[in-house]
């Protein structure tokens, strides 16, 4: 077959979708069943492996060997809390293989286990086939989407799944970003518009705010809940009917996997019906112990069962607005993505929240992400049509990134919600005299102290030529590429010696829950953090004052300008303070300030006398006038040996 165009694939938790940009527009491709979305399901039987509709259709007969939700496992460790809690709800087995989760199934009469990447690769391979059948050409290049909060390890694992499926993954892009691209092509606008994307799918919920101006997209903020979606609404209905069955027939079907599966399938169908009708009926023959289950549910009851979940979708909306520093009145467009946004109650809650504003439903919510991915695939593979030409895409980093400086302080180089790709450089210095190396520790998180943040990696820069503290200049650079991969490097300016690290760690960067939790905790702890920051700052200012003062009076330029008695007085007091500091690293802010006042009492009169006699200092004092000191950031000897410079 000849080589086909690049495709866009929305690899969803519950459903996937594939699109292609050709003849100047996006076409969403239907599968062999005529469906434009395909279940992200893989089933193993005695005779074959089924993927998509075929797998989902036989799930009731073969629940333990039908795998879905691989996206919830991908790029995570087995002991990840998310994996542990999800396992309780899955009919298939998840086993621990050297810290990584694998799904275990019976296939052709033997026990097999697969990594999540392998399961996802089967779904991706299916999407590739669907595209090839439609195009009549081989498809290799693809853009694959992931939730905005997927961390590095999850993105990498998704990319690996593509490789396993025989795809060349041009880029991993965020789902909301993809939806924004779909939206951007539909609505070309000149003036800047703020767009809120509300993506409630089968398994995940993402809210993103973007600005679109002259074909340029910028993600301003993202928020959400990795564990909210259509399946949760199904679960509420399933539990409701299990309880009803108990009441009517005095029997508990909850332990019977097949009965629960059949009930779930009926509930999912009823839910869809309730988006267009106010009532749905459920008829299951011989559900349990030969009992037929015929019942019905109203839209109002469905809404009541899910009231807290539906209302809860507004929390991330408020959070995204806060993070983007926007008021809800400043949002120009609200875009619905994901099948669950068809639920009338959710549309109403959202519309009411935005004071009756019209919602944008012009894009089929199930297809918007694949649509945008297809456009991005065309751009990356060099499509020259004008619809695509002037479109540029900017993503953001979900957490602040920085390094630890003296005293365990988190010094941020890249703030959260910074547009990527991005590069930031800052110069640091040594903390003690003749220090031969520095340890660069890279952290992500929003807290003031690194101990409260997440360590991503560390490396040493050695071979710094002997020099007094504060003299060497070490330039640290953080560089994030378009795929969100972080490179950190450090260079000693005097020798040109360099060392660097690429952060792609398996142990998983933070999950979305962690990020959410950290941001919430950060707000809660902000006050504590400020207090700690002030404390370290007053300690550092005292420390640099003492060291600078000592260096000043020992400077040979002052020979003969200062009498020995005064000089000794200052040195004694400085040494006393330095000794006190060594013993009192964790003192309170007030104590540091008190010690500094005591030291100034001794030094100020002598220094003033010097100034008057000399008419200004010859050649300027080393390290600036004492008390100017280094910026507040010197610190605990226990901290790493690196210090921030202005």
Curated annotation (Swiss-Prot):
Location of N6-succinyllysine modifications: 319, 512
Pfam families: HSP70
Keyword Cell membrane: yes
GO CC, alphabetical: lysosomal membrane; melanosome; nucleolus; nucleus; plasma membrane; Prp19 complex; ribonucleoprotein complex; spliceosomal complex
Modification N-acetylserine occurs at: 2
Cross-link (Glycyl lysine isopeptide (Lys-Gly) (interchain with G-Cter in SUMO2)): 512
Chain positions found as N6-acetyllysine: 108, 246, 319, 328, 512, 524, 589, 597, 601
Catalysis performed (reactions): ATP + H2O = ADP + phosphate + H(+)
Modification sites for N6,N6-dimethyllysine: 561
Phosphoserine: modified positions: 153, 329, 362, 541
Location (main, coarse): cytoplasm
UniProt subunit comment: Component of the chaperone-assisted selective autophagy (CASA) complex consisting of BAG3, HSPA8/HSC70, HSPB8 and STUB1/CHIP. Identified in a IGF2BP1-dependent mRNP granule complex containing untranslated mRNAs. Interacts with PACRG. Interacts with HSPH1/HSP105. Interacts with IRAK1BP1 and BAG1. Interacts with DNAJC7. Interacts with DNAJB12 (via J domain). Interacts with DNAJB14 (via J domain). Interacts (via C-terminus) with the E3 ligase STUB1 forming a 210 kDa complex of one STUB1 and two HSPA8 molecules.
The protein's name in its UniProt record: Heat shock cognate 71 kDa protein
Species of origin: Pongo abelii
Gene name of the encoded protein: HSPA8
């Amino acid at each position: 077959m000849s080589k086909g165009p690049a495709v866009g694939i929305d690899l969803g938790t519950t459903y996937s979708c594939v699109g292609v940009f050709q003849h100047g527009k996006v076409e969403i491709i239907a599968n062999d069943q005529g469906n434009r979305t395909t279940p992200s399901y893989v089933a193993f039987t005695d005779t074959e492996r089924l993927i998509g509709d075929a797998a989902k259709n036989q799930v009731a007969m073969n629940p333990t060997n039908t795998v879905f939700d691989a996206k919830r496992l991908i790029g995570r460790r087995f002991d990840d809390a998310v994996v542990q809690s999800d396992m309780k709800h899955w009919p298939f087995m998840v086993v621990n293989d050297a810290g990584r989760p694998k799904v275990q199934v019976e296939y052709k009469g033997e026990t097999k286990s697969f990594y999540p990447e392998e399961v996802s690769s089967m779904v991706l391979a299916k999407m590739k086939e669907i595209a090839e059948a439609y195009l009549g050409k081989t498809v290799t290049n693809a853009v694959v989407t992931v939730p905005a909060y997927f961390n590095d390890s999850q993105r990498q694992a998704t990319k690996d799944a593509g490789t396993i499926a025989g795809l060349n993954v041009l880029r991993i892009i965020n789902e909301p970003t993809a939806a924004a691209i779909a939206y951007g092509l539909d609505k070309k606008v000149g003036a800047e518009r703020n767009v809120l994307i509300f993506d409630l799918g089968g398994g995940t919920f993402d809210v993103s705010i973007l600005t679109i101006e002259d074909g340029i997209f910028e993600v301003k903020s993202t928020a959400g809940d990795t564990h909210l979606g259509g399946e949760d609404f199904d679960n509420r209905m399933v539990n409701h009917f299990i309880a009803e069955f108990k009441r009517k027939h005095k029997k508990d079907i909850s332990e019977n996997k097949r009965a629960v599966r059949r009930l779930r399938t009926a509930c999912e169908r009823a839910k869809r019906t309730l988006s267009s009708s106010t009532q749905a009926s459920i008829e299951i023959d011989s559900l349990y112990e030969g009992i037929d289950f015929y019942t019905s549910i109203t839209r109002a009851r469905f809404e009541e069962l899910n009231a807290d979940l539906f209302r809860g979708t507004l929390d991330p909306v408020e959070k995204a607005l806060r993070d983007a520093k926007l008021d809800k009145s400043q949002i120009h467009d609200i875009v619905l993505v994901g099948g669950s946004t068809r639920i009338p109650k959710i549309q109403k809650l959202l519309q009411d929240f935005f004071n009756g504003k019209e919602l944008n439903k012009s894009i089929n919510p199930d297809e918007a992400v694949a649509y945008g991915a297809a456009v991005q695939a065309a751009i990356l593979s060099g499509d020259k049509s004008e619809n695509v030409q002037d479109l540029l895409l900017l993503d953001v980093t979900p957490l602040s990134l920085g390094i630890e400086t003296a005293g365990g302080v988190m010094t941020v180089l890249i703030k959260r919600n910074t547009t990527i790709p991005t590069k930031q450089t800052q110069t640091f210095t040594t903390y003690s005299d003749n220090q031969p190396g520095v340890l660069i520790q890279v952290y992500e998180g929003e807290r003031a102290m690194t101990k409260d943040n997440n360590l991503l990696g560390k490396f040493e820069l050695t071979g710094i030529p002997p020099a007094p503290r504060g003299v060497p200049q070490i330039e640290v650079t953080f560089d994030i590429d378009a795929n969100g991969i972080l490179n950190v490097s450090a260079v000693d300016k005097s020798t040109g010696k360099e060392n660097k690290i690429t952060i792609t760690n398996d142990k998983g960067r933070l999950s979305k829950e962690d990020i959410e939790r950290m941001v919430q905790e950060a707000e809660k702890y902000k006050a504590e953090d400020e207090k700690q920051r002030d404390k370290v700052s007053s300690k550092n200012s005292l420390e640099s004052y003492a060291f600078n003062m000592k260096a000043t009076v020992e400077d040979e330029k002052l020979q003969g300008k200062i009498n020995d008695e005064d000089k000794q007085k200052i040195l004694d007091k400085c040494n006393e303070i330095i000794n006190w500091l060594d013993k009192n690293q964790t003192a309170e802010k007030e104590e540091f300030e008190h010690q500094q006042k005591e030291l100034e009492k001794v030094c100020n009169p002598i220094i003033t006398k010097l100034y008057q006699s000399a008419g200004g200092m010859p050649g300027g004092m080393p390290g600036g006038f004492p008390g100017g000191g280094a910026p507040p950031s010197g610190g605990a000897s226990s901290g790493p040996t690196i210090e921030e410079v202005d």
